[in-house]
Amino acid sequence: MEYISFRSLQHYLYCPHRWGLMEIDRAWAENFYVVKANALHERAHSGVSYSLRGRKTYTDVDLWNDELGIIGKTDCIEESKDGLCIVEYKPTKPKTELVRHDDAMQLFAQKLCADAIFETDCKVQIYYADVKRRFNVSFDSSFDSELTVILSEMRRYIAR
């Protein structure tokens, strides 16, 4: 089975054409927005762990789920007395919604992996750098079936 990364999943849902240019054709150049997002993620992908306000924070955490064939890194996982919480960093808050669907699906995939690895039910938050705020993200039952369909679609395109 072809493993799909969290990043690839998010890119596919954002724009399948752009995903194809990046992942299949390898014909994509980074622009200002990609560079800005990379700078935001620099600390999150440092691999450094630290403690702050009663929470232990682990950055650049490897996650995977062999059953689903998904793999990748989460920006950070925080451990507190309340349990684990995945935090994903994004440069800008969407104008019309709290969380874009492509970002929510990326976080859902990360949650499935973390829940399986750590045998828990972790919380999920998204942090928007432009407003310097975190927002809780929740998922309904439709995410499970949608993720399965999307991963199958992506694997069909990759296999061509």
Residues of each region from the PLM?
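Metal-dependent nuclease catalytic cores that hydrolyze phosphodiester bonds in DNA/RNA
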Residues: M1-I86, P91-K95, M105
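Residues in well-ordered beta-strands of folded domains
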Residues: D60, I77, F108, Q125-Y127, ...
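Metal-dependent nuclease catalytic regions and adjoining charged, substrate-binding loops involved
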Residues: D66-E67, L98, A116-R160
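Generic hydrophobic/packing signal
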Residues: F6-R7, F108-K111, V124, Y157
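Short, intrinsically disordered/low-complexity patches at protein termini
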Residues: R43-S46, A109-K111, A159-R160
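Short, charged, amphipathic alpha-helix that recurs within catalytic cores of restriction-modification
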Residues: D102-A114
